[in-house]
Structures are given as structure tokens and as C-alpha cells.
């Protein structure tokens, strides 16, 4: 009986220690987790509008990737660079110059910036922390993101 109580107490301690960490959430199969969000790289090139629509169909709450720190960009680059090599992925920003966008397509605040040009839609390089403007009708790879 004493051994059972000891083992039960030990399991309770382990459970409680994990409950305050990110162990409480997990991303669906094929998605990668970072800072309580899930990300997936898709190896197909489509225009910005179709890319945003595609992301919203992948998972509830999913949109084109939004960035809120250089560390988050580094995480996404670690996922895109090995798969897509030297290319570009759509980000959840469009009509930035025409409408002075202040938020991402997922509704979060535009609180981190790394501009490198002007146009309607914004891409991120798959190999480093640079954003470039491109014609929204051009075809680029897709990274989707949602809050876990």
C-alpha cells in the first residue's frame, strides 16, 4: 500500500510539473510548434489570395504566417530553408502601401517589421530574415500558422 501511494504521488508530481509548460498543447501531424503556435510549410506555389484561402482551409484559425519577432522568423527559416532552398513564401500582409495595413491577415498586430521594398503583397525569403514586396498575382510557396 505504501509503495502504491509513493508511485501515485510521484506521478502526480510529474504531471503537475508538466502542466505549466508547452506540453499542454500539441500540433496536428505534419505541423511544427513554436511559442504556442503551429506552422506548416507547403511545397506548392500559388498567388497570395489563393494562399490565404488555402491556409484558412487547412485548420480552424489558420492563416498565412505572421511574424512577431526575429526569433520566430528564425524558427520558420529553419523549417523552410531545407525544404524550399532559396525562394520566397507568402506572409499574411497585403495592400500594405495602399491601405496602410496595421495587422496581419490573422488579425494580429503588425508589431515586427523587416521591409525591403514596396508592393501590394509581402514575401519572406526562405533563407534569412528579409521581407520583399511582390506582385500579389505571382506564385510563391505557402507557410500557414495558427494558435494552438
Swiss-Prot record:
It holds the Pfam family Lectin_C. Gene3D superfamilies: Mannose-Binding Protein A, subunit A. InterPro entries: C-type_lectin-like (IPR001304), C-type_lectin-like/link_sf (IPR016186), C-type_lectin/snaclec_domain (IPR050111), C-type_lectin_CS (IPR018378), CTDL_fold (IPR016187). Residues 34-145 form the C-type lectin domain. Disulfide bonds join 27-38, 55-144, 121-136. One of its GO terms (molecular function) is toxin activity. Residues 1-23 form the signal peptide. Keywords: Disulfide bond, Hemostasis impairing toxin, Platelet aggregation activating toxin, Secreted, Signal, Toxin. Expressed by the venom gland. It is found in: Secreted. The keyword Secreted applies. Its main location: secreted. One of its GO terms (cellular component) is extracellular region. Platelet-agglutinating factor that acts in a vWF-independent manner. Binds specifically to platelet GPIbalpha (GP1BA) to a distinct binding site from that of flavocetin-A. Belongs to the snaclec family. Tetramer of heterodimers of alpha and beta subunits (alphabeta)(4); disulfide-linked. This is Snaclec mucrocetin subunit beta. It comes from Protobothrops mucrosquamatus (Taiwan habu).
